[in-house]
Design a protein with these regions (language model features):
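C-terminal flanking helix
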Residues: 62-69
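Short, Lys/Arg-enriched N-terminal segment that forms or immediately precedes the first helix
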Residues: 2-18
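N-terminal helix-turn-helix DNA-binding core of bacterial DNA-binding proteins
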Residues: 13-50
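Basic, amphipathic "hinge/linker" alpha-helix immediately C-terminal to the N-terminal HTH DNA-binding motif
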Residues: 81-99
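Amphipathic alpha-helical dimerization/coiled-coil segments
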Residues: 9-13, 96-105
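Beta-hairpin "wing" of winged helix-turn-helix
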Residues: 69-84
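Residues within the DNA-recognition helix of helix-turn-helix
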Residues: 57-60
Length: 105
């Protein structure tokens, strides 16, 4: 991906929130899209972010932000069937559509 393509991809995210979209939101989104589903621990290790940063970011990109505001609805969390205390993250239908549009750039 060249810089023009990167700019186009980032513009797709800017539409969601032109004034407030931390770069680690984009990083988390891209890792989840690439791996299909991941644990919080995997995201922490790959992106060198704290558990609280991952948790807040995933919530903001989910259905409801932690402060009760509507989220971006790009990610879904669900209990890991193999380990009930662990949560997995995957792209929502809206997130999959955005991921496909970025892949086509």
């Amino acid at each position: 991906m060249d810089l023009r393509q990167l700019g186009t991809a980032l513009a797709a995210f800017a539409v969601l929130s032109p004034t407030h979209l931390p770069i680690h939101f984009v990083q988390i989104f891209l890792v989840v899209g690439e791996k299909k589903q991941v644990t919080f621990q995997e995201l922490m290790g790959e992106l060198n972010l704290t558990n609280s940063a991952i948790s807040r970011s995933v919530m903001a990109m989910g259905e409801t932000h932690r402060k009760g505001k509507p989220g971006f609805e790009l990610l879904e969390t669900f209990k890991d069937p193999a380990e009930g205390r662990r949560f997995l993250v995957r792209l929502s239908p809206k997130g999959r559509a955005l991921y496909r549009s970025i892949q086509s750039i």
